Amino acid sequence: INEAGQEQVQINGEKIMFRGTNRHETDDQDGRAISKEDITTDLKMMKQFNVNAIRTSHYPNNPYMYGLADELGIYICDETNAESHIGAVSSNIPSGYPIWNTSVMDRTQNMVERDKNHPSVVIWSLGNEATYQVYNMDENYCFYNSTQWILQRDPSRIRKYERDNRYTKGDRTKSMVDIYSSQYWGVDSVKSQVTNTGNKLPYIQSEYAHAMGNALGNFKEYWDIFRNYP
């Protein structure tokens, strides 16, 4: 907690800033059949360019990657394989339908139990872009169940889910997340978030700068904000 009463992400008592990237397990030559050599090349190149964090978008990665991240000192946001992209339609999956509880919980537990002993893992992500509305925080909502299970199983790590940033200060059991995250916010929106002293949670722009070809823009403007408002 800083002097303004805002929470901070700290590792071993030291405040940190994630300089991260989303990483899919694909290769330009081998497709999804990537080798240990491919993974090693990826992570060593990231270290070379001062990338210190990876979000495993959007599923747990090859176990070899986590051991290498432990060795190289790269933080991991480990993401549950729960994604639908159907949130904009009336059938909204998985939403508040209890039929999805078992499958989402199974994937969450498999990830946590497999990767819990890796010191590189500092964040558990509940999923990606599945459920575009806010539902009651009760046993019918699959992500409420999974976030409460994570909190009980491993309270030492941070929980995140950019589709549901509800939290109650001082009571993690009444919160969906421990860190606020967003995707594809504009520069002005990001600056408003980080300069508003009423926002108490740490903040991550978990997806931005997505481009096809060379159409990327505003990268410097984003990073000016990240560096000026750490």
Regions found by a protein language model. Name each.
Residues I1-M46, G67:
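N-terminal carbohydrate-binding accessory modules
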Residues M45-M46, A53-P230:
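Substrate-binding/catalytic cleft of secreted carbohydrate-active enzymes
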